[in-house]
UniProtKB/Swiss-Prot annotation:
Residue segments, region Disordered: 500-529, 545-631, 697-767
Keyword presence, DNA repair: no
Main location as per UniProt: nucleus
Family: Belongs to the SDA1 family.
Residue ranges, compositional bias (Basic and acidic residues): 511-522, 697-729
UniProt gene name: SDA1
Biased amino acid composition, Basic residues: 730-746, 754-767
Originating organism: Saccharomyces cerevisiae (strain ATCC 204508 / S288c)
Entry keywords, A to Z: Cell cycle, Nucleus, Phosphoprotein, Protein transport, Ribosome biogenesis, Transport
Modified positions (Phosphoserine) in chain numbering: S278
GO process terms (BP): protein transport; ribosomal large subunit biogenesis; ribosomal large subunit export from nucleus; traversing start control point of mitotic cell cycle
Name used for this protein in its record: Protein SDA1
Listed Acidic residues bias regions: 551-573, 586-595, 605-629
Annotated GO CC locations: nucleolus; nucleus
Note: Present with 3640 molecules/cell in log phase SD medium.
Length: 767
């Protein structure tokens, strides 16, 4: 009887039939075919009804199929017919069990795609939502491929776009776009989890390129999808960057700004996303979970929890900071295939062309920042950008500090100095002059310093010396800005400063260069500044000459084993640890006479020098100071092979030189360093209101006791002891006591006993 009642319920209870079909498909094949035939009939009715007309009414109010069919309320407030709900239920049922009957449902996925793509205007929102979820389910069951699903989702995403489309104003268009966009991200993420699915990625990127080729604004979805996949580290190749390059050169303003902001902010967003994921995994404690498993009752659930925890820890170690990242950690700007062409097109089409007026000021500043970052990173030549900056370099300009930071980033040593000099002169005239505020002057000098740090020849001596005079300003920001400019040119070109501003070390270098007839340290435009040979090799040659280790007869074992017990180790400083996995070339032809020569010279160094020896020492110091790096490299490279000890000592000498240098401005690649607009104004301290000062006073009082007497304030409430009362008693009241008067009559012997007893008691105190 139970089986008969169950069989009677199957045609109406789809959920029960679905469960039974999954358990035993062969036994319930007839019931499945019955429901599948019902689905086909409803589908045909919907398709015919959609072709007949009533697109807008069907889209908003549902479709009443059949005569006298009742309606029911939809999930979003619209009326939905019974046949619509039946079709939704049957579509979900067939999608769940189609893998059990692959022959009977071979055309089911294509029918769903046809129904969705050709009749989406007439289908109710609930049915479209159900078909989208079913297509995603079919892809998860490997019934359809990921490429087929993407080909079904992208046309709908474009069709329901709100830009220039009547369907975009549909009440459910926003929900549909969100569903499609989320499904696309999840699909691409799952397909690229175990490894890069290059076939799927290239096909999806081709669709994005096709969207951006169209002149309308539908390509905004290509930029949104690309940026999100870049943030998650799913797409990280140059083809992805080319999509955003094409977007930045588009005709539509929204697409252009989407591409521009990708190059400005996408890398930072990706790093933040990676750090957030790392922080989520850092809060896990495996040892605590193992302890709980040992103490608590062992169950299957806790065992699975422990297994999942171990997998999480292994994944964390695999993807941790020490392991290679799952994506290429390259900036998007570095992956450009033609940065020079991209920069020229960006400037020509958006900043200097006929379409420049369609961007507002905020968008123009973003374009300036991107263009300047491209020029500074790749050392490009776009000469028109420097004259374009001139009309915006005024103190009254909105967001002028961001424009000034873009000016600094766009400068490098390959740009002709006369081109940048015009911009520097404009900044000096507008910002660094009499009558301007201290913050304006500080911003101007700091901007000039940032420009000159990238292109030292961009300023002439007269203007530099005028700006340096602001070092005596009473304003702290202006003072610090001028001193930073002095510190820069002390290291780069000290001869451009006045003698009083050069400093001791820089003045000595200039004087020695003049006496020795050497070339000026001032950089020359177009000169090759690439590193040749080994950096700091002259320091090693000087050190060997001082310590008498320039002889060709050296001990090979001593050179290889750096940490040896010798007198030189005590003189030269700490031991040097050598990496065992590195390979070094060692000169094996050295003899064993080095130690004897070194010991003999060390014994001579303890003797006092005569006047002749002093003169000789001064002469040697001058010769050491005049060591040419190229000559030292040629000499050492042609006479010996550097050993691990030599490389270790060379690194040590480099560190000593950097520490010993008083005005040590670190030389670094200024192209990669971004200029923060907030740092150009310098330290600004505005006058505080009474409420702000009072708040600062109250913050200082937190965590400390109130000032005043501690009398009567004890940690534990109690009365005073007799000893405390006797000690605090007024001396005039206790001067006549017998014990006090007896001290005056005490003999010397008794006083000594009391003193010794007191000392002994003090020593024993605390033990």
């Amino acid at each position: 009887m139970g089986r008969r009642s169950r069989a009677a319920m199957l045609p109406t209870n789809i959920i029960l039939l679905q469960n039974l079909v999954k358990r035993d498909p062969e036994s319930y094949q007839e019931e499945f075919l019955q429901q599948y035939a019902h689905y086909e009939s409803l589908r045909d009715i919907f398709m015919l009804n959609g072709l007949a007309g009533g697109d807008s009414a069907a889209a908003t109010n549902g479709l009443d199929v059949g005569n006298g069919s009742s309606t029911m309320a939809g999930t979003n407030g619209t009326t939905m017919s019974t046949s619509t709900s039946q079709l939704i239920e049957l579509v979900g049922f067939v999608s769940q069990v189609c893998s059990c009957f692959p022959r009977e449902t071979a055309n089911f996925p294509s029918e769903l795609k046809q129904l969705l793509l050709e009749h989406h205007k007439s289908l109710p929102f609930e049915l479209k939502e159900k078909i989208l979820s079913c297509l995603t389910m079919l892809r998860n069951k490997d019934v359809i491929t990921a490429e087929e699903l993407i080909q079904s989702l992208f046309p709908l995403l474009v069709a329901y776009s709100s830009h220039g489309n009547s369907l975009g104003v549909n009440s459910h268009a926003k929900e549909l776009r969100k569903i499609i966009y989320t499904n696309l991200i999840s699909l691409l993420k799952s397909c690229n989890t175990n490894g890069k699915n290059q076939k799927l990625n290239k096909s999806t990127q081709a669709v994005c390129f096709n969207l951006l080729d169209q002149p309308d604004s539908q390509g905004i979805w290509a930029t949104k999808l690309t940026r999100e996949l870049w943030r998650r580290g799913i797409w990280d190749d140059s083809r992805t960057v080319e999509i955003m390059t094409q977007a930045a050169l588009h005709q539509d303003v929204k697409i252009v700004m989407s591409g521009v902001m990708f190059f400005l902010d996408a890398d930072r967003e990706r790093e933040e996303n990676f750090e957030e994921n790392s922080e989520d995994e850092d809060g896990f404690d495996l040892d605590a979970l193992r302890h709980k498993m040992q103490v608590n009752k062992k169950t299957g659930r806790r065992g699975k929890k422990l297994e999942n925890a171990i997998k999480t820890v292994k994944k964390k170690k695999k993807n941790g900071p020490g392991a290679p990242q799952g994506y290429l950690n390259f900036s998007a700007i570095h992956l450009l295939r033609d940065p020079q062409g991209f920069a020229e097109k960006l400037f020509k089409e958006h900043l200097s062309g006929k379409t420049k007026n369609k961007f507002d000021m905020e968008q123009k500043i973003s374009l300036m920042q991107l263009l300047s970052r491209l020029i500074g990173t790749h050392k490009l030549i776009v000469l028109g950008i420097y004259t374009f900056f001139l009309k915006y370099l005024t103190p009254k300009q909105r967001d002028v500090t961001r424009i000034m930071s873009a000016c600094a980033q766009a400068c490098h040593d390959l740009v002709p100095p006369e081109v940048i000099n015009v911009m520097v002169r404009k900044i000096a005239d507008e910002f660094v002059s009499d009558g301007v505020a201290n913050e304006v002057a500080a911003a101007g000098i700091n901007t000039i310093r940032e420009i000159c740090s990238r292109a030292p020849l961009a300023i002439d001596e007269i203007l530099l010396q005028d700006l340096v005079e602001y070092k005596g300003s009473k304003a702290k920001g202006v003072n610090m800005a001028a001193k930073s400019l002095i510190a820069l040119y002390r290291d780069v070109a000290p001869e451009m400063l006045k003698k009083k501003d050069r400093g001791k070390n820089a003045a000595m270098e200039v004087q020695e260069a003049k006496k020795g007839g050497k070339d000026s340290k001032r950089p020359q435009f177009g000169a090759d500044n690439s590193v040749q040979g080994i950096a700091g090799i002259e320091l090693l040659a000087k050190w060997k000459k001082e310590h008498g280790e320039e002889s060709e007869n050296e001990d090979a074992d001593a050179n290889w084993e750096v940490d040896v017990d010798s007198e030189e180790d005590d003189v030269d400083g700490e031991w040097v640890t050598m990496d065992s996995d590195k390979e070094y070339d060692v000169d094996m032809e050295d003899s064993d006479d080095e130690k004897d020569n070194a010991k003999g010279k060390e014994s001579d160094s303890d003797l006092e020098l005569s006047d002749d020896d002093d003169e000789k020492e001064v002469k040697d110091e001058q010769e050491d100071a005049d060591i040419d790096p190229e000559a030292a490299f040629r000499e050492i490279a042609s006479t010996r092979i550097l050993t691990p000890a030599d490389f270790a000592k060379l690194q040590e000498l480099r560190n000593e030189e950097s520490v010993a240098k008083i005005m040590g401005i670190h030389k670094q690649d200024k192209r990669e360093e971004l200029v923060d607009a907030s740092t150009l104004t310098g330290p600004i301290k505005y006058k505080q209101s009474r409420e702000e000062r009072l708040q600062k006073v109250l913050e200082g009082r937190e965590g400390r006791d109130k000032f005043g007497s501690r009398r009567g304030k004890r940690d534990n409430m109690r009365s005073t002891t007799n000893r405390e009362k006797e000690r605090r008693k007024n001396f005039v009241m206790s001067i006549h006591k017998r014990s006090v008067r007896g001290k005056q009559k005490m003999s010397l012997r008794d006083k000594q006993k009391v003193l010794r007893a007191h000392i002994t008691k003090q020593k024993k105190k605390g033990y």
